Design a protein with these regions (language model features):
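Positively charged n-region of N-terminal signal peptides that target proteins for export
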Residues: 1-4
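Ligand-binding pockets and gating/stacking loops
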Residues: 19-414
Length: 414
């Protein structure tokens, strides 16, 4: 079987079996702040209380030999539908560099901002995607500036929905809003038309015009109408923001949106980690298990890659002392990701960490850039030539700006 690279993570050295079908969509459930791998996908029940903390228990999954954290009983019933990467690593313990590594596949520095994977897919789909919704959507907001287009340009950045999916009526801020009447919308479109006189990509203007009009007046806004779902379905996902965002993500994939970023916050648990996890882990368990099961039942799982993880993990050793009171710090040396769908075989564990979870023992997985490797599972070749050209343009612009600034400084000094 030809080596394939995971879309988004693109893990070096990772090779999961895939079938012939290519993925059409990606859903990234991004746990912003960094989830604890020892409490989720790589538990260490024999490592002692300083490692497992308040969660000594593990759950045997429906796949022999695979165990996960005790707070994820629903996910334990479907381990045959997903695989776990237990040895993701980039070594950074800083949020910004961690986000940048996992969202763009590159290390920070060098004066060039690389595009996020969602932006890369949006760029690849620029000529073939004819949907009325944006190609790259974040629920409800992108996790950082690195979700933008980088050197590809801002027209490929994430469209952030805003709003509250868990509310009785979910309204996408500034777009799907019942208070926006036709007159106000026509005024907005008139303002948008005025931008055509500015040096802005006309393709982007046309795209914005069509997308906004369809959002306001077209049938597409019904995709965000969760009242069309039965209460039993909404309860299955959980009434949390994460749960309802995952439900919207399923509806977006059904509508053909290529990339959906579901961002959930609160995972940066330096203090009172276990008190917070008592609520957050059951919410994740409901949301993610319902999403995978729902996609599978609707025949969408094989064509949709589902990924779940954060910018890094958390320290295996619990910080019991004040002021942390049972917290976990940042940890980029070893962390875990869940991968489902898209033709990837389920029921597998990739990599092995040490007994305490502090070191990678087998098959480290590091993020790499999509311009260096093709998004094989997504049916695309590398962006190498395009990326090189655009990086040169970006570097030339940066150099010209620095030279101009130096010139101004020289004039001021004389």
């Amino acid at each position: 079987m030809k080596r394939v690279y995971l879309t988004i993570i693109l893990t070096l050295g990772l090779c999961l079996g895939v079938n012939a079908q290519r993925a059409k969509s990606v859903i990234l459930v991004y746990l912003d702040g960094g989830p604890a791998q020892t409490d989720t996908f790589d538990p260490k029940p024999e490592a002692g209380r300083n490692i497992y903390g308040n969660y000594k228990g593990v759950i045997k999954t429906n796949v022999e030999g695979i165990e996960i954290g005790e707070k994820l009983p629903l996910l334990a019933t479907m381990a045959d539908k997903y695989s776990l990467i237990r040895t993701m690593t980039h070594g950074s313990n800083a949020h910004e560099t961690g986000h940048y590594a996992m969202i763009t596949g590159d290390s920070s520095g060098g004066g060039v901002v690389y595009p996020s994977f969602g932006a890369v897919i949006s760029y690849m789909k620029r000529d073939s995607y004819n949907g009325i919704l944006p190609c790259y959507i974040s629920l409800t907001s992108a996790n950082s500036r690195f979700n933008e287009g980088g050197f590809l340009g801002n027209e490929y950045k994430s469209f952030d929905t805003g709003g509250k999916p868990e509310a009785k009526e979910y309204e996408v801020e500034g777009v799907v809003n019942k208070q926006v009447n036709r007159q106000r919308m026509e005024q907005r479109m008139s303002l948008l038309n005025n931008f055509e006189t500015q040096p802005i990509d006309k393709h982007h203007i046309d795209s914005l015009r069509g997308v906004n009009m369809e959002f306001i007046w077209g049938d597409s806004r019904e995709i965000f109408n969760l009242q069309e779902e039965s209460d039993s379905v909404r309860q299955r996902y959980g009434k949390s923001r994460l749960g309802q965002s995952c439900l919207v993500a399923r509806r977006l994939v059904e509508a053909g949106v290529p990339f959906v970023n579901v961002r959930t916050t609160g995972w940066d648990t330096h203090k009172k980690h276990f008190q917070k996890m008592n609520t957050m882990l059951p919410e994740l368990d409901k949301a993610l298990s319902a999403l995978i099961a729902d996609l599978d039942a609707r025949g969408l799982l094989d064509s949709t890659i589902v990924l779940c993880g954060g910018e890094f993990g958390r320290t295996p050793a619990v910080l019991w002392e004040a002021p942390w009171n049972g917290g976990r710090a940042h940890f980029g040396k070893v962390f875990s990701y869940l991968v489902a769908g898209g033709g990837f075989h389920g029921g597998k564990v990739v990599g092995k960490s040490s007994e305490t979870g502090e070191k990678v023992l087998e098959r480290p997985g590091t993020p790499v850039r999509p311009d260096r490797h093709g998004l094989s599972a997504y049916g695309h070749r590398p962006l190498r030539h395009t990326a090189t050209h655009l990086r040169r343009q970006s570097a030339d612009t940066a150099l010209a700006t620095r030279q101009q600034q130096r010139g101004r400084t020289t004039l001021r000094n004389h």
